[in-house]
Regions:
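Short helix-loop-beta-strand segments that form the rim/entrance of peptidase-like active sites
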Residues: 97-119
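A short acidic, glycine/proline-enriched capping/turn motif at secondary-structure boundaries
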Residues: 12-14, 24-28, 118-119, 145
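A non-catalytic alpha/beta surface segment that caps or lines the substrate-entry region
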Residues: 1-15, 21-25
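Active-site-proximal alpha-helical scaffold in enzymes
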Residues: 85-102
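Midchain, well-structured core segments that form catalytic/ion-binding scaffolds
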Residues: 32-34, 41-49, 54-57, 61-83, ...
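Histidine-centered active-site/metal-ligand motif
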Residues: 23, 106-107, 168-169
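Hydrophobic/aromatic beta-strand patches that form the interior of the parallel beta-sheet core
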Residues: 18-20, 112, 136-138
Length: 198
């Protein structure tokens, strides 16, 4: 339901049941729905000019230095490339192909492809866990080659309404409540490394 696709590769050995989860959607930033990629073969630190006027360089994107000499896909600037999470989906499908083609031993492997990750994990919330009875699950997302992320941030939303108490300056002692100072105090209580900008 809700566009969630689940599948199972039946195990051929006594191993834990694992799950791989990928999201199907890409970030919607009001660009073209049609992907317009640019393939740069044998990337040699050249400047990439996008149709929207932006330029991609190793100065603005130092992570590109790790990919010198490789073929790289970029967006032309008129669309989102969508590597998050299409790259992970292709990796999962390739991993399943390799396991099957080489008759590798494995326990049950469950797959879940969910929609609407970028807009509040709606697909993940709709995942029927009775169809995903795993011992361990891994979210496969867009990372650097060889990189494993073993923790993630969680975002939440809250609306805080602070009402102050106004008072005439002469009679404000122990009566006036400045809502800006109350808000500042609340913000100061948030752990520094868990704020959205981190």
């Amino acid at each position: 339901s809700y566009g969630v696709l689940t599948a199972r590769l039946k195990g051929n050995g006594d191993y834990p049941k694992i799950g791989w989860i990928c999201h199907l959607d890409t970030a919607d930033i009001s660009l073209s729905e049609v992907v317009h990629p640019i393939l740069v073969e044998n990337y040699l630190e050249e400047e990439i000019k996008q149709k929207n006027g932006k330029r991609i360089t190793t100065e603005t994107n130092p992570e590109l230095k790790k990919h010198i000499g490789k073929d790289i896909l970029f967006s032309d600037g008129t669309s989102v490339l969508g590597a998050d999470d299409k790259a992970a989906i292709s990796i999962v499908m390739e991993a399943i192909s390799i396991i099957m083609e080489n008759s590798l031993e494995h326990g049950d492997i469950y797959l879940a492809f969910t929609p609407d990750e970028e807009v509040g994990l709606k697909g993940a919330k709709a995942l029927d866990l009775s169809l995903f009875p795993v011992d361990w699950a891994y979210t496969i997302d867009c990372q650097e080659k060889g990189e494993v992320v073993w923790e993630t941030f969680n975002a939440g939303k809250a609306t805080v309404r602070i009402e102050g108490v106004s008072a005439h300056p002469m009679s404000s002692k122990e009566v006036l409540i400045n809502p800006i100072l109350v808000a500042t105090e609340i913000i100061s209580l948030l752990p520094e490394k868990q704020r959205p900008e981190e």
